[in-house]
Amino acid sequence: MTRPVRTRFAPSPTGFIHLGNIRSALYPWAFARKMKGTFVLRIEDTDVERSSQEAVDAILEGMQWLGLDFDEGPIYQMQRMDRYREVLAQMLEKGLAYPCYMSAEELDALRERQREAGLKPRYDGTWRPEPGKVLPEPPAGVKPVLRFRNPLTGTVVWDDAVKGRVEISNEELDDLVIARPDGTPIYNFCVVVDDMDMGITHVIRGDDHVNNTPRQINILNALGGEPPVYAHLPTVLNEQGEKMSKRHGAMSVMAYRDAGFLPEAVVNYLARLGWSHGDAEIFSREQFVEWFDLEHLGKSPAQYDHSKLSWLNAHYIKEADNARLAELAKPFLDALGIDDAAIATGPALDAVVGLMKDRATTVKEIAEGATMFYRVPAPEADALAQHVTDAVRPALADLVAALKAADWTKEAVSAALKATLAAHKLKMPQLAMPVRLLVAGTTHTPSIDAVLVLFGRDVVVSRIEAALA
């Protein structure tokens, strides 16, 4: 194919967008970027009753968060109705489409008779004009649907980039309804006109659309358009092995942001959820674009693995800039009752984040761990009784004296701890646990020397001395 590459993401704004949906944006985006082509966003909003601006906003927000920038759009199908009607009129004029007056009740009865006879239920062409055929008299007051005059013979063939060569006999296809009685065009028709007008060269979409493809190819051929390359992606399954969907508990794309995931981790994970580049598990957005091709798209359903995504997110958190993580942590801290004023009273948030991030799988976990630096500790009485015993109090007093005299560095604090342990013949947990409780209010912290340095000498000394008083 010598045409400049043009791909598209064409969601229907009828609900929230989950990872399985957004993967159908990621791959065409990556292919367009790889081929120096154009990525088009088209909003297929012809289902007026179910479409909503809220769903459109969710699509745009999710794409923006993941960095899936589009070159053209968003293009709304509802704003192209005049164009669809123009093409419908041309098809009627050329005999490519015809009015059909068969009612829904008549069609249901026909299909029931066909099922009883062991035949495939389908429209039988009652109103299809043929040479020498006498059509029924149109019923008074009935508005017809418009049907596409599908070829009666031959085969629809395409080389799917995922499924390989696909052949469908035209005998399997009936004459598709392309416009409702009120003149509103049907999805399969609008898609063809859009892809043709927009010069789409590659359609990368879920394989739930594969049954539409032969019908769309036939309409496209009838209109004189050039069929694109199709790549039908296998389904994304949830952790229970069911198709990923809202009904089966799928999270929206933005719910991952709100849970503390980084967009680069989600993009990396999604890229591997149906495509591979050798054994590479971790790669940048730039590497993904450089490596992406249609030949290595998976042919089997991909199963979502939350633990794998969490592992990737932990990796990207460790690699992330502390200042960036600090800004991302602020909304989570605010939700935990730690506002900017509280943060200003404690150690620099960048430094706190730098300490906490090596143990975290999400930004939310970083924020939860960081709260100890911005709250007055309130250790539980049982924990105090267990760890701050009469036997350890002399060691705590000596540690305070050593910390008052030490340089306030991680190395000096570590040396003071070790000297106190040796002098009192204690093991690290016997001293570190009560110190953590008294200073931080919890026994679960990163390395004790690093934590104490961040709290600052005055806070550490005053809190331990208050417990010994």
From Swiss-Prot:
Naturally occurring in which organism (per UniProt): Burkholderia cenocepacia (strain ATCC BAA-245 / DSM 16553 / LMG 16656 / NCTC 13227 / J2315 / CF5610) (Burkholderia cepacia (strain J2315))
Gene: gltX
Family: Belongs to the class-I aminoacyl-tRNA synthetase family. Glutamate--tRNA ligase type 1 subfamily.
EC class of the enzyme, as a word: ligase
Biological role: Catalyzes the attachment of glutamate to tRNA(Glu) in a two-step reaction: glutamate is first activated by ATP to form Glu-AMP and then transferred to the acceptor end of tRNA(Glu).
Self-association state and partner proteins as the record states: Monomer.
Protein name: Glutamate--tRNA ligase
Keywords: Aminoacyl-tRNA synthetase, ATP-binding, Cytoplasm, Ligase, Nucleotide-binding, Protein biosynthesis
Motif ('HIGH' region): 11-21
GO biological process terms on file: glutamyl-tRNA aminoacylation
Magnesium as UniProt keyword: no
Short sequence motif named 'KMSKS' region, residue ranges: 243-247
